[in-house]
Amino acid sequence: MRTIAIAAVFAAGFGAGILVAGQTQQAPSLPAERVTGIGGVFFKARDPKTLRTWYQEKLGIAIQEGAGFGLFLWRERQDSSREGTTVWGVFPETTKYFAPSAAPFMINYRVRNLEALLTQLRSAGVTVDGKVVEDFNGKFAWVVDPEGNKIELWEPKPGY
């Protein structure tokens, strides 16, 4: 009986703490333009071909023929008729694509309006690396986070 009473007091106190926390803490406001998802994960390898084969054979990541990367296909939650992709790629350890970052990885984030996001980031003092590049996949730009990691921002064309 005593155990039940202690558990009830603890549960009531915990519940009240959540209620109080919910009433006193504001969720941080989100910026107008923001990341909408992960567009890709890229990392360096000493032997990219062998590593890609390992991931394909052991974990089932289907590597695109001749491209050297894998694609994960999914549907948008708000509109299930719209498909999206997340790219998985292995780069040679000598690649300069991740520069100026010294990190052996780079994450690509999907965005809705790249130009507006870059304006917002520049206004906030974020280091923007170079100009916007556009190709058949969409628009790309790069920023550097406070720890020096290069981040790729991607506004995909429809169907990506």
In which residue ranges do the predicted regions lie?
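Short secondary-structure boundary/capping segments
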Residues: 78-80, 96-99, 132
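Core segments of cupin and vicinal oxygen chelate
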Residues: 32-36, 42-88, 123, 141
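Acetyl-CoA-dependent GNAT
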Residues: 92-94, 155-156
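Bacterial N-terminal signal peptides
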Residues: 7-16
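Vicinal oxygen chelate
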Residues: 2-3, 18-46, 65-67, 86, 93-160, ...
